[in-house]
């Protein structure tokens, strides 16, 4: 698909004598499913076309969400709608994510793409304006359940026992035993599950408790603090 678009873009360059930018909405949620949505694919495609075609330097891919997700897309859309004075809900009520809508054009809310969309709206505290086969409350609860079930299976595969218990069941590793409790190298700390940046070494201090201690967190860490009494 991208190759066809690129070839057509080259024909526009030749005919109109203009530079062409190809904008695509591929995002990180597509990487595992679609090989042609991965960053390395577009890097390779651009490189190959530039070697094999005249004036291919006048064609570029614009992939603003290649490292983002559907939350990133919706958040960007909300800001853009505010900037140009249009109603976000009206715009998105005219979109559809599902690959299997019913005869009335309603999404089931159960496909992978549906669930990603539903959870993105939830993350931003919004209700999806499109009509689903079932109520919003029901499709939302199903999406939350499926996500938890999928993530639990994934983390059981990927994490060792103590990592799984700490991240999924709120367990605590014994003090002075963890991999990073006495870590002194400069660097950044990321969540082993979701990959979000949580802390940097500049935030770390020696509390003497036997666990890694930080006096603050990254501004995008989204950590929920719970008072321990």
Where are these regions (language model features)?
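Nucleotide-activated chemistry modules centered on ATP-dependent adenylation/adenylyltransferase
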Residues: 1-146
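A short Gly-Trp-Pro
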Residues: 147-229
């Amino acid at each position: 698909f991208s190759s066809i678009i690129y070839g057509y873009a080259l024909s526009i360059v030749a005919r109109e004598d203009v530079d062409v930018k190809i904008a695509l909405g591929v995002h990180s949620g597509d990487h595992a499913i679609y090989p042609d949505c991965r960053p390395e694919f577009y890097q390779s495609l651009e490189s190959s076309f530039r070697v094999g075609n005249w004036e291919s330097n006048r064609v570029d891919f614009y992939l603003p969400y290649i490292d983002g997700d559907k939350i990133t897309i919706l958040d960007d859309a909300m800001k853009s709608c505010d900037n140009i004075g249009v109603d976000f809900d009206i715009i998105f009520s005219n979109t559809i994510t599902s690959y299997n809508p019913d005869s009335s054009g309603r999404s089931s809310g159960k496909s992978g793409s549906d669930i990603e969309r539903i959870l993105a709206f939830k993350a931003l505290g919004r209700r999806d304006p499109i009509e689903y086969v079932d109520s919003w409350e029901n499709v939302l609860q199903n999406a939350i359940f499926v996500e938890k079930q999928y993530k639990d299976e994934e983390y059981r595969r990927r994490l060792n026992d103590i990592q799984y218990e700490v991240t999924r069941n709120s367990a605590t590793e014994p003090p002075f035993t963890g991999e990073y409790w006495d870590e002194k190298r400069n660097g950044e700390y990321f969540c082993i599950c979701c990959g979000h940046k949580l802390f940097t070494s500049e935030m770390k201090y020696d509390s003497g408790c036997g666990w890694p201690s930080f006096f603050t967190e990254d501004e995008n860490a989204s950590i929920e603090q719970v008072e321990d009494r």
